[in-house]
């Protein structure tokens, strides 16, 4: 049935993302069974043709492919552990966000019960689920990914299989979210900085967009430097860049703004300079990230 792209699917967990996943399966024509602790969250999906299971066990029995999306692995394991017998022989895809270590622990639990287990990470917000550009990362059971790749395409057209280690998809998830939250914090802080002098966010936003467009080319150089542990400072060294950060901090503090995130960056730069790397490029701070202060 998987090859026909109409495999019966079960979705456990109907938060905003779980509802989007179940809705995408329904839109693609998959018989879809849903379960959530708060049963009313299934109402809209049932109106679209989903079957509401009364219990997790009933939900699992209805699906050839079982997809879980809850708040963390503590919750997912609390739901799944009593269902080892029902899940045996089925394909389980866990799209819950958590640490690589917890994903590997869950994989070991599944392997001990004959459950074919694939871990995954959703890298888009709910409105993008089901679209060709929706990026989902998977790692773990290759057999599940290959057997149900067409089914999983209902969730997004940009699926990536990252290998047999169940911890890789969560690792990529957290690393990419690190980029996202750090960038968002920087953007919001910058808007607070210009806003303190009366510039609106809308006025300044075009300049942020132009500035972000410079980053991809810089990222290539950073990645090469990190892989080779070579951090040329010919285009800008840490000593020079630290002075620029000091100016930002001074300007922020003069306006009564919290400068915590940037102060942490400046402290990291200071450690690198103290270690004798003031002439290196910014990427050399990775050496200090790899040996955090006790």
Where are these regions (language model features)?
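NAD(P)+-binding Rossmann beta1-loop-alpha1 motif at the extreme N-terminus of oxidoreductases
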Residues: 1-68, 90-91
């Amino acid at each position: 049935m998987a090859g026909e792209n109409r495999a019966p699917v079960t979705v456990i967990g109907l938060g905003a993302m779980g509802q989007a996943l179940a809705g995408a399966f329904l839109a693609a024509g998959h018989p879809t069974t849903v379960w959530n602790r708060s049963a009313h969250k299934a109402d809209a999906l049932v109106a679209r043709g989903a079957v509401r299971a009364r219990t997790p066990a009933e939900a699992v029995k209805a699906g050839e492919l079982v997809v879980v999306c809850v708040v963390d692995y503590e919750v997912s394991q609390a739901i799944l552990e009593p269902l080892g017998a029902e899940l045996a022989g089925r394909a389980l895809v866990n799209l819950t966000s958590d640490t690589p270590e917890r994903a590997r622990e869950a994989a070991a639990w599944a392997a001990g019960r004959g459950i074919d287990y694939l871990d995954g990470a959703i890298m888009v917000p709910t409105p993008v689920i089901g679209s060709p550009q929706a990026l989902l990362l998977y790692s773990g059971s290759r057999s599940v990914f290959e057997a149900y790749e067409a089914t999983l395409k209902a969730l997004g057209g940009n699926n990536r299989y990252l290998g047999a280690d169940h911890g890789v998809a969560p690792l990529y998830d957290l690393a990419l979210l690190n980029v996202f939250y750090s960038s968002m914090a920087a953007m919001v802080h910058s808007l607070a900085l210009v806003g303190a002098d009366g510039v609106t966010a809308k006025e300044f936003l075009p300049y942020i967009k132009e500035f972000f467009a410079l980053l991809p080319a810089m990222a290539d150089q950073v990645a090469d430097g990190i892989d080779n542990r070579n951090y040329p400072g010919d285009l800008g060294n840490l000593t020079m860049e630290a002075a620029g950060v000091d100016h930002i901090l001074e300007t922020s503090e003069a306006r009564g703004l919290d400068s915590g995130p940037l102060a942490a960056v400046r402290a990291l730069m200071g450690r690198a300079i103290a270690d004798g790397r003031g002439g290196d490029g910014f990427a050399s701070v990775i050496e200090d990230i790899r040996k955090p202060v006790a």
